[in-house]
């Protein structure tokens, strides 16, 4: 099982837009590999190893950029037979995602100015 739902607080906290400089916790369910990476993009790509926080559940907490912008994320699942990518649903409306052979459509987080 590979699963993330950007509309469910169990997998994305907080839901909705995030104030600049605040933290965002993302979780991913995976029973196919012990190695899951969170990939983010805010003008530069970053990879974060996700930590097991329960049976088949992985978590990473990141600080979003300190200025308003669109912040993007998806997941890389390392398997013996090759990497699997997991990203936004093909309709790009968020919620439950999809597996991709190559670069996935990323999930979007709106980072806003809290002032």
Regions found by a protein language model. Give the residues of each.
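Structural beta-strand segments of beta-rich domains
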Residues: 22-26
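Short proline/glycine-enriched turn/loop motifs at strand-loop junctions of beta-rich domains
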Residues: 29-35
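Conserved aromatic beta-strand anchor motif in extracellular beta-sandwich/beta-rich domains
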Residues: 36-42
């Amino acid at each position: 099982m590979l699963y993330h739902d950007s509309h469910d607080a169990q997998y994305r906290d907080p839901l909705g837009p995030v104030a600049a400089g605040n933290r965002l916790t993302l979780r991913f369910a995976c029973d196919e590999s012990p190695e899951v990476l969170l990939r983010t993009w805010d003008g530069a790509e970053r990879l974060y190893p996700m930590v097991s926080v329960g049976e088949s559940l992985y978590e990473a907490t990141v600080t979003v950029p300190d200025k308003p912008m669109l912040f993007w994320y998806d997941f890389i699942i390392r398997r013996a037979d090759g990497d699997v990518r997991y990203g936004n649903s093909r309709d790009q409306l968020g919620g439950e995602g999809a597996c991709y052979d190559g670069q996935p459509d990323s999930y979007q987080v709106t980072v806003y100015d809290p002032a």
